[in-house]
């Protein structure tokens, strides 16, 4: 039987690397795997499933945070608050479709004034006087 033998440095254990760092992700792959197993979504969970799910969740979070950061910058703020997340999600067509049924606490409502309630434009009378001068 061939064993490893007494190699130099055999006593030193190799530093453990997380599955998140192996996949190049910030979201915790191990925690997501644990939740998938405990949630009884299926009898067994493949090795790639939690990695893929972590990557998808990380991408969605980055997308929402980028748009919310832009909304905060537009409002001359340095801190993202729920209002900025609401504006970011509702102004993006795909995120609105994904999170359409979700309520964001303290998000407020989207600014909207019906066209019928807006004041009439006065520029139309000026155009008619210019036409009279040309004739």
Curated annotation (Swiss-Prot):
Tissue and organ distribution: Expressed preferentially in meristematic tissues of young seedlings, in stigma and ovary but not in pollen.
Self-association and partners: The nucleosome is a histone octamer containing two molecules each of H2A, H2B, H3 and H4 assembled in one H3-H4 heterotetramer and two H2A-H2B heterodimers. The octamer wraps approximately 147 bp of DNA.
Native species: Triticum aestivum
Pfam families: Histone, Histone_H2A_C
Protein name: Histone H2A.4
Domain of life according to the entry: Eukaryota
Compartment annotation: Nucleus; Chromosome
PANTHER family: HISTONE H2A
Cellular component per GO, a single term: nucleus
Keyword list, A-Z: Chromosome, DNA-binding, Nucleosome core, Nucleus
Family: Belongs to the histone H2A family.
Entries under CDD domains matching the protein: HFD_H2A
């Amino acid at each position: 039987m061939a064993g490893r033998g007494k190699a130099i440095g055999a006593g030193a254990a190799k530093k453990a690397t997380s599955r998140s760092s192996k996949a190049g992700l910030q979201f915790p792959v191990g925690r997501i795997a644990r939740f998938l197993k405990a949630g009884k979504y299926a009898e067994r969970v493949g090795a790639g499933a939690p990695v893929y799910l972590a990557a998808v969740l990380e991408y969605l979070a980055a997308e929402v945070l980028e748009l919310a950061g832009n909304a905060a910058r537009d409002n001359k703020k340095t801190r993202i608050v729920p209002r900025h997340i609401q504006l970011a999600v509702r102004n993006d067509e795909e995120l609105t479709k994904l999170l359409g049924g979700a309520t964001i606490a303290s998000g407020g409502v989207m600014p909207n004034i019906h066209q019928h309630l807006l004041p009439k434009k006065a520029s139309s009378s000026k155009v008619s006087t210019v036409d009279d001068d040309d004739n």
